Amino acid sequence: MNFETIIGLEVHVELNTNSKIFSPSSAHFGQEANANTNVIDWSFPGVLPVINKGVIDAGIKAALALNMDIHKKMHFDRKNYFYPDNPKAYQISQFDEPIGFNGWIDITLEDGTSKKIRIERAHLEEDAGKNTHGTDGYSYVDLNRQGVPLIEIVSEADMRSPEEAYAYLTALKEIIQYTGISDVKMEEGSMRVDANISLRPYGQKEFGTKTELKNLNSFSNVRKGLEFEVERQAKVLRSGGVIRQETRRYDEASKGTILMRVKEGAADYRYFPEPDLPLYEIDDVWIEEMRHELPQFPAQRRATYINDLGLSSYDANQLTATKAMSDFFEKAVALGGDAKQVSNWLQGEVAQYLNAEGKAIQEISLTPANLVEMIGIIADGTISSKIAKKVFVHLAKNGGSAREYVEKAGLVQISDPDVLIPIIHRVFEEQEAAVVDFKSGKRNADKAFTGFLMKATKGQANPQVAQQLLAQELQKLLD
């Protein structure tokens, strides 16, 4: 029997506001334990939450970016549960009226086909703290994360393969990152994914019993965990077994999923409206203000790069992977840079440098104007492509004018025959053995002189001019 895979994803995105959702404490990552807390985060008696307007702004932007309807009368609810990292014994979230609902995004699969994935809802809530279990037998609570604003984005169960789930997460991350509401860094916990997966026989309308997957700390692990579950559940069903409603975690060591707990039924969180927060009215003026702040998104940019600038689909995808890189590219082209040349540099030397340094493009000193100027002096013969790599590293570290640096550092390409011919003759004198090989007709002996000449000029000889002059002077040796 063959089975159809049914997948839905729940994605928590940490919003990059300066302060928390209901308290003035800093929301920044990486501080000493409990440094970013106050009496609201610790839930002291009598303290009251105050909404951070920037969180609602971010929620509106997310809803618009995900093609969602917006609840114009929005409220918060209490989700009741007890856990040590939750001192109030409830979480302030949204239940029946989330800020966004009925959305969708398009995804592109590896074969180039596209599919629309519906999004059920996007709701605002506060994050919980973090428990740490020490080797001394004690457990410790860090409330730095308590109250950090989140938006949870819940898809419909529209994905039919792990590949589609991976494509959905990739597209969702791009869109959220472009809005500027989050840096969506999974390694820092600002994007977290839970997956729900079930199988059903083809043709059956009812969903099968779902399994929830946790501990998915990368898109790759989401895909691997789902692929494992497809095989595991199919094997159970084909052998006549029954799938239990479980929560499982992905284990990187075994490349499989491990049972965490069996769910007997849906949890009852006893939601009710948060009495300490008012109803918030989101009018059309507010919505349009947020819409005006949104950028052009990756799909539209890719279409422009392909249709108007003549780039390949691959190049367009690479350039739009982050908003910072896409913005850099567009500014460089607007300054007169050739789109293909700019693209080649950004995907080549620039990308290699950023990876080696562990930095984003906005964190180095290279500017679009610097890059365009450097490409220009390559084109006019001032420097060679080889020297340009050295110039680029200088610009990445120090900025400034490419032409001024080249002139100051003595890196201008040598194209004058009156300068190059004497150097060629000196090379002949120094490389007597190579000259003998050449005269005797030894195969490829002439090619060695190119390397000798480039070494003698410290790489500054114009390659095209050098080749012509070398051929000319070598021929004279045979005459």
UniProtKB/Swiss-Prot annotation:
It holds the Pfam family GatB_Yqey. Keywords: ATP-binding, Ligase, Nucleotide-binding, Protein biosynthesis. SUPFAM superfamilies: GatB/YqeY motif, Glutamine synthetase/guanido kinase. One of its GO terms (biological process) is translation. Its EC number is 6.3.5.-. InterPro entries: Asn/Gln-tRNA_amidoTrfase_suB/E, Asn/Gln-tRNA_Trfase_suB/E_cat, Asn/Gln_amidotransferase, Asn/Gln_tRNA_amidoTrase-B-like, GatB, GatB_C_1, GatB_Yqey_C_2, Gln-tRNA_amidoTrfase_suB_CS. Gene3D superfamilies: 1.10.10.410, GatB domain, N-terminal subdomain. GO terms for molecular function: asparaginyl-tRNA synthase (glutamine-hydrolyzing) activity; ATP binding; glutaminyl-tRNA synthase (glutamine-hydrolyzing) activity. It catalyses: L-glutamyl-tRNA(Gln) + L-glutamine + ATP + H2O = L-glutaminyl-tRNA(Gln) + L-glutamate + ADP + phosphate + H(+); L-aspartyl-tRNA(Asn) + L-glutamine + ATP + H2O = L-asparaginyl-tRNA(Asn) + L-glutamate + ADP + phosphate + 2 H(+). Belongs to the GatB/GatE family. GatB subfamily. HAMAP family: GatB. Allows the formation of correctly charged Asn-tRNA(Asn) or Gln-tRNA(Gln) through the transamidation of misacylated Asp-tRNA(Asn) or Glu-tRNA(Gln) in organisms which lack either or both of asparaginyl-tRNA or glutaminyl-tRNA synthetases. The reaction takes place in the presence of glutamine and ATP through an activated phospho-Asp-tRNA(Asn) or phospho-Glu-tRNA(Gln). Heterotrimer of A, B and C subunits. This is Aspartyl/glutamyl-tRNA(Asn/Gln) amidotransferase subunit B. The gene is gatB.
